[in-house]
Amino acid sequence: MNYEFEREIGFINSQPSLAECLTSFPPVADTFQSSSIKTSSLSHSTLIPPPFEQTIPSLNPGSHPRHGAGGRPKPSPAGSRGSPVPAGALQPPEYPWMKEKKAAKKTALPPASAAAAAAATGPACLSHKESLEIADGSGGGSRRLRTAYTNTQLLELEKEFHFNKYLCRPRRVEIAALLDLTERQVKVWFQNRRMKHKRQTQCKENQNSEGKCKSLEDSEKVEDDDEEKTLFEQALSVSGALLEREGYTFQQNTLSQQQAPNGHNGDSQSFPVSPLTSNEKNLKHFQHQSPTVPNCLSTMGQNCGAGLNNDSPEALEVPSLQDFNVFSTDSCLQLSDAVSPSLPGSLDSPVDISADSFDFFTDTLTTIDLQHLNY
């Protein structure tokens, strides 16, 4: 009994829901189709029915399934249709001419703002046509085609410019009539030609000034180089002269130092002397006459005679060479010391030797040299 009662209670409690499900099946299909169409773009899965609570009208109080089903699709097309209308009314379509030129954009904005939302497209079309006309008119007025002059026209204009850079009005009218040009074209051409001439003259002046500056700089550099060269040559000449003087004084000092000890030493030093150097030394020492000159000559003559008379080779060798060396070293140095205390004085003094003494001296020297060579 209890089982049957519970079964009946459950059947009674579940019976209204089944009936409502059966009665609400057609609207559920409508809503299912509309929802599946919307969600098909998002998910490509199989068709899934909506939740059970949304399909039951009893769970949604104050709404009938038919009214709800019939009322839901109505606002959706209204919303979809009404959404572009305010967008079109608030934002009129933008054309490329509106972006490029400001004047056309300003003329197009007042009718668009004054027009209603429903008739927004009409004024836009009208303003577009008007703006195109305005743009064409403004473009034609502001942009002028460049005048293409012929060769004859340019030649005549250049000739006139060569004689007159500024034209008076009668002459300008005459040239325009001759060349089939307007007065304005002739005027503009002369203005442009004057500017060109001015630029050319300025460029030439700048080039000339630059060339002069470069030439001045080059000349200054050349002068500086010449001055440096002259200074360098002067320094070299001065240094060369100083070196010559120092070398000359050094030679004099060395000669005086070598001859001074030889003159003071009493012992005779025997060393071989070449004939040429002995002649030069004897000539230098016999520049000044002194009382010792005859003694030197007599001793040299006696020694030479003794050497010539002796036939033995030893006598020829020893006495003659020793006597000649004694004459060349001791007697001549004593003579130079007696005549002048220093060597430069004796070197710079004039020659006072007589012709007879010079011939005698050269003859004796040649005989001694010949004997020495024969031996």
From Swiss-Prot:
<dbReference type="GO" id="GO:0021568">
    <property type="term" value="P:rhombomere 2 development"/>
</dbReference>
<keyword id="KW-0217">Developmental protein</keyword>
<comment type="similarity">
    <text>Belongs to the Antp homeobox family. Proboscipedia subfamily.</text>
</comment>
<feature type="short sequence motif" description="Antp-type hexapeptide">
    <location>
        <begin position="94"/>
        <end position="99"/>
    </location>
</feature>
<feature type="DNA-binding region" description="Homeobox">
    <location>
        <begin position="142"/>
        <end position="201"/>
    </location>
</feature>
<dbReference type="GO" id="GO:0042474">
    <property type="term" value="P:middle ear morphogenesis"/>
</dbReference>
<feature type="region of interest" description="Disordered">
    <location>
        <begin position="41"/>
        <end position="93"/>
    </location>
</feature>
<dbReference type="GO" id="GO:0001709">
    <property type="term" value="P:cell fate determination"/>
</dbReference>
<dbReference type="GO" id="GO:0001227">
    <property type="term" value="F:DNA-binding transcription repressor activity, RNA polymerase II-specific"/>
</dbReference>
<feature type="region of interest" description="Disordered">
    <location>
        <begin position="197"/>
        <end position="228"/>
    </location>
</feature>
<dbReference type="GO" id="GO:0035284">
    <property type="term" value="P:brain segmentation"/>
</dbReference>
<dbReference type="GO" id="GO:0045668">
    <property type="term" value="P:negative regulation of osteoblast differentiation"/>
</dbReference>
<dbReference type="GO" id="GO:0021658">
    <property type="term" value="P:rhombomere 3 morphogenesis"/>
</dbReference>
<dbReference type="GO" id="GO:0008045">
    <property type="term" value="P:motor neuron axon guidance"/>
</dbReference>
<dbReference type="Pfam" id="PF00046">
    <property type="entry name" value="Homeodomain"/>
</dbReference>
<dbReference type="GO" id="GO:0009953">
    <property type="term" value="P:dorsal/ventral pattern formation"/>
</dbReference>
<dbReference type="GO" id="GO:0060037">
    <property type="term" value="P:pharyngeal system development"/>
</dbReference>
<feature type="region of interest" description="Disordered">
    <location>
        <begin position="257"/>
        <end position="278"/>
    </location>
</feature>
<dbReference type="InterPro" id="IPR017970">
    <property type="entry name" value="Homeobox_CS"/>
</dbReference>
<keyword id="KW-0804">Transcription</keyword>
<dbReference type="GO" id="GO:0045944">
    <property type="term" value="P:positive regulation of transcription by RNA polymerase II"/>
</dbReference>
<dbReference type="InterPro" id="IPR009057">
    <property type="entry name" value="Homeodomain-like_sf"/>
</dbReference>
<dbReference type="GO" id="GO:0007379">
    <property type="term" value="P:segment specification"/>
</dbReference>
<dbReference type="GO" id="GO:0045665">
    <property type="term" value="P:negative regulation of neuron differentiation"/>
</dbReference>
<dbReference type="GO" id="GO:0071300">
    <property type="term" value="P:cellular response to retinoic acid"/>
</dbReference>
<keyword id="KW-0238">DNA-binding</keyword>
<comment type="function">
    <text>Sequence-specific transcription factor which is part of a developmental regulatory system that provides cells with specific positional identities on the anterior-posterior axis.</text>
</comment>
<keyword id="KW-0805">Transcription regulation</keyword>
<dbReference type="GO" id="GO:0002076">
    <property type="term" value="P:osteoblast development"/>
</dbReference>
<keyword id="KW-0371">Homeobox</keyword>
<dbReference type="GO" id="GO:0000978">
    <property type="term" value="F:RNA polymerase II cis-regulatory region sequence-specific DNA binding"/>
</dbReference>
<dbReference type="GO" id="GO:0005654">
    <property type="term" value="C:nucleoplasm"/>
</dbReference>
<protein>
    <recommendedName>
        <fullName>Homeobox protein Hox-A2</fullName>
    </recommendedName>
</protein>
<dbReference type="GO" id="GO:0009952">
    <property type="term" value="P:anterior/posterior pattern specification"/>
</dbReference>
<dbReference type="GO" id="GO:0061061">
    <property type="term" value="P:muscle structure development"/>
</dbReference>
<dbReference type="InterPro" id="IPR001827">
    <property type="entry name" value="Homeobox_Antennapedia_CS"/>
</dbReference>
<keyword id="KW-0539">Nucleus</keyword>
<dbReference type="InterPro" id="IPR001356">
    <property type="entry name" value="HD"/>
</dbReference>
<dbReference type="InterPro" id="IPR020479">
    <property type="entry name" value="HD_metazoa"/>
</dbReference>
<dbReference type="GO" id="GO:0048703">
    <property type="term" value="P:embryonic viscerocranium morphogenesis"/>
</dbReference>
